[in-house]
């Protein structure tokens, strides 16, 4: 337990026979339950986990193996673990990938904001950790930074970065609100989940943690397939959030600003294409065409910035700043001392 809260860790696995044993063997002492979810791995992942379960005896946390009959994606694997943790009424459920890229020594820093009631969901942020630029492969850093910017707009959590991290912790109350069957099942799962959390006005903490690479993990990313899917997913989830949060549940004029930004943006593209076509055909840039294009482009930018500002202000109260990783403390210590946790007084 962590400060009187039960803690489970979901470990999604796909072809991690060389890595998953290390993850299970280094699980922190305060973890009560480990839910390993095998996503139909064709390698020996299941056998490795079963050997660990047989050999652990009474040492360490309880380990439960859950299996998918077919490969459904990392998001589906995590949601399978979430559903089991929710069924068991576990207070806090964290996620640690089976490839060993998530430092178990930092799990307490991730769990603490949720255990202490400061956040409903906490996620790692590797991009802002000192030295991250030199540790994270350059193409991953830049790609993650771009997707993080797009996720800010789609989700409404403007303070978060490193949107693609899977190192997270969530409260039981948050899990009770979520429709786990509807969550995106594959690589875009963390982005989709943030959008759904925002719909319920749940607080999200961004915890700066050390990035871990080159520990034997094998990347399963396929950029040519992921980029088109992620672009469509973020656009679709953004539009869904606008409809659900600012039209159906409560009206806010920011949807009109976003709509105006989209309309004038499309108009500016049309005028620009016409301008270029006429310049190629005649060698002359029509003055009126250029003026209208400039006006629509400027209007689109202004409408979009106003809409973002409105959205940022509407969601500012969901921002949970975590300045430094707080240490874990034995259950009951806070009650015995009668003191507030460091950094939370007032």
Report residues per predicted region:
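Hydrophobic helical membrane-anchoring modules
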Residues: 1-2, 183-346
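Short hydrophobic beta-strand elements that form part
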Residues: 8-12, 35, 67
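A conserved acidic beta->alpha catalytic loop
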Residues: 38-47, 70, 100
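Acidic helix N-cap motif at the loop->helix transition within catalytic regions
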Residues: 18-22, 43-53
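Acceptor/aglycone-binding surface of glycosyltransferases and processive sugar-polymer synthases
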Residues: 66-87, 92-95, 104-187, 213-228
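Short helix-capping segments at alpha-helix termini
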Residues: 54-61, 89
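N-proximal low-complexity "stem/linker" segments adjacent to membrane-targeting elements
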Residues: 1-26
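Cell-envelope/extracellular polymer assembly enzymes that use nucleotide-activated donors
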Residues: 6-8, 33, 192
């Amino acid at each position: 337990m962590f400060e009187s809260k039960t803690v489970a860790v979901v470990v999604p696995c796909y072809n991690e026979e060389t890595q998953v044993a290390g993850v299970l063997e280094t699980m922190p002492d305060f973890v009560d339950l480990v839910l390993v979810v095998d996503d139909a791995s064709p390698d020996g992942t299941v056998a490795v986990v079963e050997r660990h379960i047989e050999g652990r005896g009474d040492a360490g946390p309880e380990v439960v193996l859950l299996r998918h009959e077919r490969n459904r994606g990392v998001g589906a694997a995590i949601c399978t673990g979430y559903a089991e943790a929710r069924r068991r009424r576990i207070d806090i459920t964290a996620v640690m990938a089976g490839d060993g890229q998530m430092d178990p020594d930092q799990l307490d820093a991730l769990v603490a904001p949720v255990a202490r009631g400061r956040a409903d969901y906490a996620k790692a942020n590797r991009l802002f950790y000192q030295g991250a630029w030199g540790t994270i492969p350059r193409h991953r850093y830049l790609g993650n930074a771009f997707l993080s910017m797009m996720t800010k707009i789609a989700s409404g959590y403007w303070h978060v970065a490193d949107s693609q991290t899977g190192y997270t912790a969530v409260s039981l109350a948050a899990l009770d609100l979520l429709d786990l069957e509807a969550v995106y099942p594959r690589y875009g799962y963390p982005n989709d989940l943030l959008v759904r959390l925002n719909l319920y006005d749940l607080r999200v903490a961004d915890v700066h943690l050390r990035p871990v690479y080159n520990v034997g993990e094998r990347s399963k990313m396929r950029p040519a397939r992921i980029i088109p899917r992620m672009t469509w997913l973020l656009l679709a989830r953004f539009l869904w959030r606008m409809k659900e949060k600012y039209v159906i549940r409560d009206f806010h004029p920011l949807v009109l600003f976003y709509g105006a930004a989209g309309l004038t943006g499309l108009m500016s593209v049309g005028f620009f294409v016409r301008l270029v076509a006429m310049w190629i055909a005649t060698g002359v840039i029509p003055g009126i065409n250029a003026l209208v294009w400039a006006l629509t482009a400027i209007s689109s930018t202004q409408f979009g910035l106003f809409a973002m500002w409105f959205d940022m202000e509407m969601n500012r109260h969901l921002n949970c700043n975590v300045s430094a990783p707080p240490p874990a403390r034995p259950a009951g210590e806070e009650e015995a001392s009668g003191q507030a946790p460091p950094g939370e007084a007032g």
